[in-house]
Swiss-Prot record:
One Pfam family, short name: PGK
Ranges annotated as spanning the membrane: none
Protein name as it appears in the record: Phosphoglycerate kinase
PANTHER family documented for this protein: PHOSPHOGLYCERATE KINASE (PTHR11406), PHOSPHOGLYCERATE KINASE 1, CHLOROPLASTIC-RELATED (PTHR11406:SF23)
Subcellular location: Cytoplasm
Family, per entry: Belongs to the phosphoglycerate kinase family.
A single MF term (Gene Ontology): ATP binding
Listed GO CC annotations: cytosol
Organism this protein belongs to: Shewanella denitrificans (strain OS217 / ATCC BAA-1090 / DSM 15013)
Assembly and binders: Monomer.
EC numbers: 2.7.2.3
């Protein structure tokens, strides 16, 4: 990929506009989870260290486009950055027709979604943004799958468009996992529905040596194997699709293993009594909420021998501890593995946090939808734009 990297550029006295993902939860004017902000700090600091006048933009939440709404203002983010950085930080609310930005300071543009035309990648808006800078830096992998004015259009018209360090790291890690993976390659795909992950399953089943399914997705594969799933969440209309995926995997010498034992309950609640049963003994009133210890150990053995691991989604309802043992065993196996491992997706990151294995995973992807679309083999518009500008 012929993408220009920000790290390679001379930014002395340059006006540098960085698109970051500063979309964080805010309550009573305070940032309540700062993971994305912490991840963004090194890029801002690097631009400052390189002698640039730094401008930063992001979206926050889902306001009505084109309308200011104080609930979605980036002011709490500015307050956070002002404390975290040793440089002056200020918010610019009216910036499209020009903004003063001095070397050594950070100007944060108000929520890009307050601009009419942001979502539609409006050309006039994109050109106005591009006119504000000498260098545009795309550093928000989490929004790279959206062709919008602040993630795509501006980069088409800016004098120089490049990838920031966060985006470059993400693309390197995903490339390492998918383009030329160390074998055997194992993918763990969980979540509630096959329908939302069907293209991911199809794409991965063609490149991995072992595809492991969990959560509600696994229930559809259990049904496809001819077992009763009781009242469990599953998709009857996709049973044939599951059979086809298994047949495809086996024709390549791989497999999509179905659990041999499962943890069931009669209701979905934090206090539901968990019962371990053989997969052939699920009753009509049971709901499957986790894989059993035998299945978890079998999957752990697969993970132990892997060269590359891609993890997207838990294998059970791990939010309730009595249904979390399967996901915990998988998480520990990934943590103990010597393989190159990459984890992504909201629920997956929550599991990584719960079992405290963040420092044992090779790379944690910040992008939810973008991570999935990359796994599906789709072209990400922002990445395509950077490749075009770098060519």
């Amino acid at each position: 990929m012929a993408i220009i990297n920000m790290t390679d550029l001379d930014l002395t006295n340059k006006r540098v506009l960085i698109r970051q993902d500063l979309n964080v939860p805010v309550s009573d004017g305070m940032v309540t989870s700062d993971a994305r902000l912490r991840a963004s700090l090194p890029t801002i600091q690097l631009a400052l260290d390189k002698g640039a006048a730094v401008m930063v933009m992001s979206h926050l939440g889902r306001p009505t486009e084109g309308e200011f709404n104080n609930e979605f203002s980036l002011q709490p983010v500015v307050d956070y950055l002002a404390k975290a950085l040793k440089s002056p930080v200020r918010l610019a609310t009216d910036y499209l027709d020009g903004v003063e930005a001095n070397v050594g300071e950070v100007v944060v543009f108000e929520n890009v979604r307050f601009n009419q035309g942001e979502g539609k990648n409006d050309e006039a808006l994109s050109k106005k943004m591009a006119a504000l800078c000498d260098v545009y830096v795309m550093d928000a992998f989490g929004t790279a799958h959206r062709a919008q004015a602040s993630t795509h259009g501006v980069g088409m018209f800016a004098p120089i468009a490049c990838a920031g360090p966060l985006l470059a790291q993400e693309l390197d890690a995903l490339g390492k996992a998918l383009d030329n993976p160390a074998r055997p390659m194992v993918a763990i795909v969980g979540g509630s529905k096959v329908s939302t992950k069907l293209t991911v399953l199809e794409s991965l089943s063609g490149i991995v040596d072992q595809l492991v399914v969990g959560g509600g997705i696994a229930n559809t594969f259990i049904a496809a194997a001819g077992f009763n799933v009781g009242k469990s969440l599953y998709e009857a209309d996709l049973v044939d699709e599951a059979k086809r995926l298994v047949a495809n995997a086996r024709s390549r010498g791989g497999d999509i293993p179905v659990p041999t034992d499962v943890v069931v309950a009669s209701e979905f609640s934090p206090t539901a009594a968990a019962k371990l049963v053989d997969v052939s003994q699920v009753s009509d009133t049971d709901m499957i909420f986790d894989i059993g210890p035998d299945s978890a150990e079998a999957l752990a053995k697969i993970i132990e021998t892997a060269g590359t691991i891609v993890w997207n989604g838990p294998v059970g309802v791990f939010e309730f501890d009595q249904f979390g043992k399967g996901t915990e065993r998988i998480a520990r196996a990934i943590a103990d593995s010597k393989a190159f491992s990459i984890a992504g997706g909201g629920d997956t990151l929550a599991a990584v946090d719960k079992y405290n294995i963040a420092d044992k995973v090779s790379y944690i992807s910040t992008g939810g939808g973008a991570f999935l679309e990359f796994l599906e083999g789709k072209e990400l518009p922002a990445v395509a734009m950077l490749e075009k500008r770098g060519a």
